[in-house]
């Protein structure tokens, strides 16, 4: 009986134990909140910001020898020259790092950032927009214009008129070649530091130009258009004309011929005209060959008609 009662008691205890609910598991501890590090917001059009950023990039590049600078409101990049090898460094999304670039060194003029007034890029953008008519995705670039002169320029996307600035931040003037001042400035720009040319001239719808020998079989042209600084182009043409001193060409003499044509009713602000100055007559003294509308005139360097 005792054994039977004990067995019954053990069975009962086992059944009760099997029916008992296990204690609930402990509540999990809350996970710590992860906070992203904010990316520094820098507006490079604010006064002083662009210059500070370019200097920061130069410090990373470890050389001040620049061949290109690019600046927008949100990012900046520089291309430097190291032993005829280019490196590009950029600041984007709060990070400064070396980046891939298709910029190569083809004897561009090397410059330093302190030669350029980028203390207020926003002001340059405002001036450029007043001329181009667009604020869209403005970008400032500092680079050799191809004629050895380094200018600042502001372009937009979609593309509008590119606006150029001198290194000190003053605006490159737009030239009107139907005025004496436009003629004077255009000639001054294309002559630059040259003392001789094989040909020199102006075209009302193109600009001022100067030709000089490149190699024995090429001629180089310097061109200043109404809105773009001097550029150069080398063409396969053997220079056959005799060089002459460009100091002999006076802008007022060119204007005198145009003024005379105006008085005779052959020249207005919309009249297309051109003049080429060279020694094609083989006299040893260059002459000025004008085409004004449909009229042709040949003069000496003082503007007096010949023949």
What does each of the following model-derived ranges do?
Residues 26-102, 175-209:
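Extracytoplasmic low-complexity, Pro/Thr/Ser/Ala/Gly-rich segments
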Residues 59-84, 142-161, 191-216, 273-298:
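Exposed beta-strand-loop-beta-strand "reactive/processing" segments of non-cytosolic proteins
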Residues 1-11:
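N-terminal export and membrane-targeting signals
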């Amino acid at each position: 009986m005792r054994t039977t009662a004990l067995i019954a008691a053990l069975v009962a205890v086992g059944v009760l134990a099997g029916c008992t609910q296990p204690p609930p598991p402990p509540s999990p501890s809350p996970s710590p909140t992860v906070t992203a590090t904010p990316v520094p917001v820098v507006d490079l059009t604010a006064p002083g910001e662009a210059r500070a950023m370019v200097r920061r990039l130069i410090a990373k590049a470890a050389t001040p020898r620049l061949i290109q600078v690019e600046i927008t409101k949100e990012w900046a990049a520089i291309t430097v020259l190291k032993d005829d090898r280019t490196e590009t460094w950029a600041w984007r999304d709060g990070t400064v790092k070396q980046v891939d670039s298709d910029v190569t060194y083809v004897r561009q003029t090397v410059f330093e950032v302190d030669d350029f007034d980028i203390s207020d890029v926003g002001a340059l953008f405002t001036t450029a927009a007043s001329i181009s008519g667009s604020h869209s995705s403005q970008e400032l670039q500092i680079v050799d214009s191809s004629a050895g002169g380094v200018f600042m320029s502001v372009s937009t996307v979609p593309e509008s008129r590119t606006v150029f600035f001198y290194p000190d931040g003053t605006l490159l003037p737009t030239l009107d070649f139907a005025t004496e001042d436009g003629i004077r400035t255009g000639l001054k720009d294309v002559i630059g530091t040259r003392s001789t040319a094989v040909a020199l001239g102006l075209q009302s719808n193109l600009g001022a130009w100067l030709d000089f020998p490149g190699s024995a079989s090429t001629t180089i042209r310097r061109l200043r258009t109404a809105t773009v600084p001097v550029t150069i182009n080398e063409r396969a043409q053997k220079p056959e004309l005799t060089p002459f001193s460009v100091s002999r060409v006076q802008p007022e003499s060119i204007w005198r011929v145009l003024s005379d044509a105006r008085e005779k009713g052959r020249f207005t602000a919309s009249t297309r005209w051109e003049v080429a100055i060279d020694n094609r007559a083989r006299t040893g003294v260059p002459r000025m060959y004008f085409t004004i509308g449909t009229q042709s005139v040949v003069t000496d360097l003082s503007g007096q008609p010949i023949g």
